[in-house]
Amino acid sequence: MVYRTLGLFKSLYGPVDQLSSNCVRYSTSIPWDSLSKVRFILMGMTFAPVASTLDIAGVKVNSSIITVVDSSQIVSKTLNIESLDPPERMTSQLDSVSSEKAGRLILDTKSLTKCKRGGKPLVSAYWKERAMGSSLGDPKSKCAVVNELCHFGLSLKGTFDIFKSIDSIGKNLSFGIPPASSMTSSEISEASQKLFRDLFSTLLERNGWKFFFKEV
């Protein structure tokens, strides 16, 4: 197996481009079109932010493994999330962190993303609703939108339907992505990968995490 260390997202993505008053984006040439063939290793100072990110993702990653690594250890927990559904099950398998604790940590870390809707950081809005037990099924809720953004970014499936949901509430405007109705399927696929990179890199880089890309 070949390991490639990509370092901090800020260094990896280079100069920051101002996309809007509330949102920043980065650019990269990493081949994100083969996510089903790679493994992700996230390195953070604590388990909780990692658990939060996995819970937000709430995805089925085809034959992929997300490995959670603590700064004081080599490997602390490996999750095969191929069949984890619903998202809550993902956090429950991290025995060191509860869903409630992870949610509070995200809520307290408002600087994780500058991207806002309705004056509130998207991630904070997600966890506020999540903590109140709101359903993820309503495509009009901010809670569902954040979940879906990470979902299609990891699985790269159901992209068009998700973009239609984003269109319905105008969320795509915050990320500078045109309406799905005016895009070809390949453009939608490319935009979905870009949006995932933007959101996920912001979540990680702003918390000072390192990202390691592992080819298998």
Swiss-Prot record:
> What's the protein name?
Putative uncharacterized protein YHR137C-A
Further remarks about this protein from its record: Completely overlaps ARO9.
Specify the superkingdom: Eukaryota
